[in-house]
Amino acid sequence: MLLLIDNYDSFTYNLYQYFCELGAEVVVKRNDELQLTDIERLAPQHLVISPGPCTPNEAGISVAAIRHFAGKLPILGVCLGHQALGQAFGAEVVRARAVMHGKTSAIRHLGVGVFRGLSDPLTVTRYHSLVLKADTLPDCFEVTAWSERDGVRDEIMGIRHRALALEGVQFHPESVLSEQGHQLLDNFLNR
């Protein structure tokens, strides 16, 4: 079973639908309706932290769940969930250089983890005004995807823990305008 923590976002059920289409059994719980002990009782095999309209500080159980379950089960953070993953390990969340609400971007990636077998560059849909500050990302993470500005690396679009099954993507793979979203999510399920 995959537990999807809903950070009160309209895209949560798009993620739910994509994971169900990939054959996953998915349980959705709001970020303020469960405690860590509730998650333990549910005994998920995967944990996904959804997008949301706030910062990780207002994302209910999200950061605490990442800290508690890191190394115990695979975790994927999407948009706000990606930011929560970084913040849980000490990275700072800051304002993005440009607000990206409903805009597509061609991003670059390393072809590892959730990006395994995906096109590079990859067109993705972005809905965010915050990002992880690159120089605060701890060494235990590698940047696996990034946007570019004038041919130079710009903002972090994907991270992966070097030792634990933890990954984050700043964009929305579940958006209809994102390329290969199903494959990215399938890569998470079948690591």
From Swiss-Prot:
On subunit structure and binding partners, the annotation says: Monomer. Heterodimer consisting of two non-identical subunits: a glutamine amidotransferase subunit (PabA) and a aminodeoxychorismate synthase subunit (PabB).
Which key words are in the record?
Answer: Folate biosynthesis, Glutamine amidotransferase, Transferase
Q: Which GO terms describe its molecular function?
A: 4-amino-4-deoxychorismate synthase activity; anthranilate synthase activity
User: Which reaction does this enzyme catalyse, per its entry?
Assistant: chorismate + L-glutamine = 4-amino-4-deoxychorismate + L-glutamate
**Active-site residues per Swiss-Prot or TrEMBL entry:** 79, 172, 174
Q: Which residues form the Glutamine amidotransferase type-1 domain?
A: 1-191
Q: Which GO terms describe its biological process?
A: folic acid biosynthetic process; L-tryptophan biosynthetic process; tetrahydrofolate biosynthetic process
Q: Describe which pathway this protein belongs to, using the record's wording.
A: Cofactor biosynthesis; tetrahydrofolate biosynthesis; 4-aminobenzoate from chorismate: step 1/2
The molecule here is called Aminodeoxychorismate synthase component 2
Pfam families, A to Z: GATase
Which Gene3D superfamilies has this protein been placed in? 3.40.50.880
Tell me its EC number(s), please: 2.6.1.85
GO-annotated cellular components: cytosol
Gene name of the record: pabA
Its function, per the record, reads:
Part of a heterodimeric complex that catalyzes the two-step biosynthesis of 4-amino-4-deoxychorismate (ADC), a precursor of p-aminobenzoate (PABA) and tetrahydrofolate. In the first step, a glutamine amidotransferase (PabA) generates ammonia as a substrate that, along with chorismate, is used in the second step, catalyzed by aminodeoxychorismate synthase (PabB) to produce ADC. PabA converts glutamine into glutamate only in the presence of stoichiometric amounts of PabB.
InterPro entries tied to this protein? Anth_synth/Amidotransfase (IPR050472), Class_I_gatase-like (IPR029062), GATASE (IPR017926), TrpG/PapA_dom (IPR006221)
